[in-house]
Amino acid sequence: MNILTPVADRLPSREEAEEALAVLRRWAKHTPVSDVAGLAPDVPALVYPEFSRSYPRNFTVDEAYKASLPDLQNGPASLIVGAKAVIQHVGISNFRLPIRYHTRDNGDLTLETSVTGTVSLEAEKKGINMSRIMRSFYAHAEQGFSFEVIERALEDYKRDLESFDARIQMRFSFPVKVPSLRSGLVGWQYYDIALELVDRGGVRKKIMHLDFVYSSTCPCSLELSEHARRERGQLATPHSQRSVARISVEVRPGKCLWFEDLIELARAAVPTETQVMVKREDEQAFAELNAANPIFVEDAARSFCQALQADPRIGDFRVVASHQESLHSHDAVSVLTEGPTFAAESLDPRLFASLYHTG
């Protein structure tokens, strides 16, 4: 007697299983993911394609392959997420590379530099290819940098990205040899400097930023200390503290302002710059220098202002000063601007916190 095995009870062959899996994958390819998962919980894992897990070291890219790569940032306006609004700045921040700078004494210094490059984005454009900013900048990176070289880099990426406004900012720590007050020792003082080139509405502005660190002795505390000594024979010392001024200046068209020039201008305005190399005679000299130049934060802002106003190479400017009090648990701060370039209704909430120089 012949016994027929029901089809449902027969174990499918490998070929039949492969055919069934191929059918399932064809169906899943054109079916919403939720429907695929709804068929059975383990179906998504079955239909997920197998991929190579080995890095293809010998794979090469030709022009046809590059042309096939998706480019979402240059996609149609229909891909824009959110409001179709103009973005004033979009780009990359803090890409670093060694840059060669020419100094006032005709030397060259290569310094690690942090670069920020941004462009404006029109309301109907999805995005930008940010790597073009780096590629444009790297094309000029071997040159000795100046505002003129920065302009050429900015022109390149503004053209490559088809943007109407653009900006480059370069931050670095600039070393200068500074002599001590009396001992004759010399040490390296490092100054945080940033160069900024802004192209907005077809108008270009060259801007330089300097953080100048100095000591501020409180004039009121100095007088109170002297009163205690004079009236009661009581030894007292005035409070003083490390202080920082962030000086931002617009360099007038056609003018040359060296880093060293701006540093010396700041030092002449407020001579109590913190010291590098110090022996006992230098420490005593610094105490005398502070006593001869007591200064409130208002005085500091106005002293820098007076020096900046007197330099014909400088247009608009801003002084942000912070006296990081040793008497109080708070700081004394001031902001002074001249001209429209730095005028602002609002201040960055972290502006004054960014002025701390911890050494």
Curated annotation (Swiss-Prot):
One of its GO terms (biological process) is tetrahydrofolate biosynthetic process. Its EC number is 3.5.4.16. It is an enzyme of class 3 (hydrolase). It comes from the Bacteria. Pathway: Cofactor biosynthesis; 7,8-dihydroneopterin triphosphate biosynthesis; 7,8-dihydroneopterin triphosphate from GTP: step 1/1. Converts GTP to 7,8-dihydroneopterin triphosphate. HAMAP family: GTP_cyclohydrol_B. This is GTP cyclohydrolase FolE2. It comes from Cereibacter sphaeroides (strain ATCC 17025 / ATH 2.4.3). The gene is folE2.
